[in-house]
């Protein structure tokens, strides 16, 4: 299991919250105190809640669920993309389209459109079109890729969602809650923790803090996926052994007859 240390959290600045005048009182249980007008997050609680979130993500992936990484603010975009790709999951790091989950059937049509245009460029079909029309296809492709590129391979709704800054991703969380999709999130002192199933109290603005916690969640996905693959392989080998044993019994019975 991937662990997280107080040293790592301190070095990444995970303990720095928002200004005391910009806070959500519901975050009081996760706050250690204030320093120079800034709330300091209780990192002992961050470690504790991180472990719960990590285990939940790992077990969910072990059971076959997929994870959607969401973080559209500038500080989160690179980490969300890189860590989701590293663990083989989907992501949204640009604009969240309203209905991306609740109206996934329609969004899927746009994804299929992107795939068709991609195929035209890959197999050379695009060359049969006039230059002006080909340019329009390219513009559409770039636009769709920017918004939908991270979920291009998502054929069904995710089993859970990992979010950076729930205050910024309010619509995404509302859609997840409506569909009963659990949410794991980095929750800063200005956020409402109530809609979040697995709160990770922490700085959701500093790039280093975001990268650290995102990478740990990606590690949880990888660990869960490895355990799932091992279990499936063992099941497959067990079935093969049982089949071989059955054949041997039949052969022995035939020989005795």
Curated annotation (Swiss-Prot):
Answer yes or no on keyword Protease: no
Q: Which CDD domains match?
A: RPS2 (cd01425)
Example of a GO MF term: structural constituent of ribosome
The name of this protein is Small ribosomal subunit protein uS2
Q: Which GO terms describe its biological process?
A: translation
**UniProt xrefs under Pfam families:** Ribosomal_S2
Entry superkingdom: Bacteria
| Entry keywords, A to Z | Ribonucleoprotein, Ribosomal protein
Recorded GO cellular component terms are: cytosolic small ribosomal subunit
Originating gene: rpsB
Q: Where is this region: Disordered?
A: 236-257
The UniProt entry's sequence similarity note says: Belongs to the universal ribosomal protein uS2 family.
Provide the species name: Pelobacter propionicus (strain DSM 2379 / NBRC 103807 / OttBd1)
Q: Which HAMAP family match?
A: Ribosomal_uS2_B
Keyword Lipoprotein set for record: no
